Amino acid sequence: MSHIRNFSIIAHIDHGKSTLADRFIQMCGGLSAREMEAQVLDSMDLERERGITIKAHSVTLHYKAQDGKTYQLNFIDTPGHVDFTYEVSRSLAACEGALLVVDAGQGVEAQSVANCYTAIEQGLEVMPVLNKMDLPQADPDRVKDEIEKIIGIDATDAVACSAKSGMGVDEVLERLVHTIPAPEGEIDAPLQALIIDSWFDNYLGVVSLVRVRQGRVKKGDKILVKSTGKVHLVDSVGVFTPKHTQTADLKAGEVGFIIASIKDIHGAPVGDTLTLSSTPEVEVLPGFKKIQPQVYAGLFPVSSDDFEDFRDALQKLTLNDSSLQYMPESSDALGFGFRCGFLGMLHMEIIQERLEREYDLDLITTAPSVIYELELKTGETIVVDNPSKLPDVSAVADFREPIVTATILVPQEHLGNVITLCIEKRGVQRDMQFLGSQVQVRYDMPMNEVVLDFFDRLKSTSRGYASLDYHFDRYQSANLVKLDVLINGDKVDALALIVHRDNAAYKGRALTEKMKELIPRQMFDVAIQAAIGGQIIARTTVKALRKNVLAKCYGGDVSRKKKLLEKQKAGKKRMKQVGNVEIPQEAFLAVLRLDS
């Protein structure tokens, strides 16, 4: 056991975590040269296309150190994006140490700071590594200084390497086996294992990735899942090298998978404890705090026949991504679907793409909204995550919106643009610190301003240099109103929005203009209106397509022409009374792209 090292790699997006992981696998001979490819661990198509890590991946490697001993390295590659911090905290719970990878050109960014604090809070040994040293703009002294100033860990002897060229990677491994402590635990004690991740395989059932704290588990053992109390027979255990490799057993301190033909999707929840059925009194390990979704949106199948398949797909995805929550909902415009909770906009896009690709579904998404707290005049407090469920304005005494504390790290030359953007998004500055060439600003901002397009706008105003980390702080009273969209006088529940009263008229005009472009012309005029309560604040009209009924009249009396035009007008009027307007999918997403 003294030769096992469990560690995670934490870093900001694009600082080279997955490439460093590739080098480790190559140097320790985890895969042959033929099987090696760039970003081996990012196995999902989506991860490769977007160049980001979404799921944490674990690998077990054997490294022969210079002191002649062979060490077993269990390492977990973690995502760097702010929406997937939950994956990171889960991975860290299985480790004794973490490599903090920082790009030697760009320096410390907000996400590395946040993940690093999580690691330090969980009592891990953090080892700084400077990556991308082969780039001409690498400035190791400045970056070491930033690590010490911003994060507060000693970086004087941080290892310099370049994951791309392979320079200094062996030095990283050497330092790692000596810096990161060995796991603690008794091999002879009763089994106690923590489920870090699980996914559903159509042939094998639920596959669980576990970190064994105490004892051992082997094929043929009967294991007990503590939360459900059910007993399962272990079919096989093993590790990823990154290939599935079966082993005789998993012992205390190791990370590997257990397959026990669990067919029920909720049979082995993430964060649960496994033990042997012969020792049911083993205490439950502290799991992970359940994470609360920040953004809610409705997902509806285009064809109502797909509803059951959609439900199954969501169940399987929730097993693999436990931060996703969902409940059934119905909409007048879109039929039956689910209201889903996500950690952020990127998370929502990824889930929607995974549902469409992996489960072959066609989905319509409504505009996302955050959770609001309402105090009614009766004194009761309710929470609302869907604008169409808002009670009448006259019944509400106080409207409270969620406020987040956003920490932004930005080079000094882009500070002005970032401050302007934060003020536009109704932010209130908390403090500002100058750290070398970077500035750290903290703002309190309404969550609905942050989750929609703030990240993209921040990147574009700072030319990609600013980085962001945010967390929920509190609820605060605000002057909010519900903006309804009416098409030909009928409210469309799926298009309702909650906006600040000051922006309502502008948003209303922008939304009706956008809808006018997206709704195809019909045989009759289509009136698109935006309303707050009973007051219409904006209107546009999609003009009718009309046939030239006068084409056949050459000359002749004017009363003949009038008669034909009146007849056409009467026909259009009749059509309008019975006609339905088809709203295309783009119109539901138009709400997202309103430039505030």
From Swiss-Prot:
The species this protein was found in: Pseudomonas putida (strain ATCC 700007 / DSM 6899 / JCM 31910 / BCRC 17059 / LMG 24140 / F1)
Membrane topology type: Peripheral membrane protein
Keywords on record: Cell inner membrane, Cell membrane, GTP-binding, Hydrolase, Membrane, Nucleotide-binding, Protein biosynthesis
Family statement drawn from the similarity comment of this UniProt entry: Belongs to the TRAFAC class translation factor GTPase superfamily. Classic translation factor GTPase family. LepA subfamily.
Protein's name according to its UniProt entry: Elongation factor 4
GO biological-process terms attached to the record: positive regulation of translation
Class of enzymatic activity (EC top level): hydrolase
Catalysis performed (reactions): GTP + H2O = GDP + phosphate + H(+)
Compartmental location: Cell inner membrane
GO MF annotation, one: GTP binding
Keyword Cell membrane in annotation: yes
Source species, domain of life: Bacteria
One GO CC term on file: plasma membrane
Major location category of this protein: membrane
EC number: 3.6.5.n1
Protein task: Required for accurate and efficient protein synthesis under certain stress conditions. May act as a fidelity factor of the translation reaction, by catalyzing a one-codon backward translocation of tRNAs on improperly translocated ribosomes. Back-translocation proceeds from a post-translocation (POST) complex to a pre-translocation (PRE) complex, thus giving elongation factor G a second chance to translocate the tRNAs correctly. Binds to ribosomes in a GTP-dependent manner.
Domain tr-type G: residue ranges: 2-184
Record: residues binding GTP: 14-19, 131-134
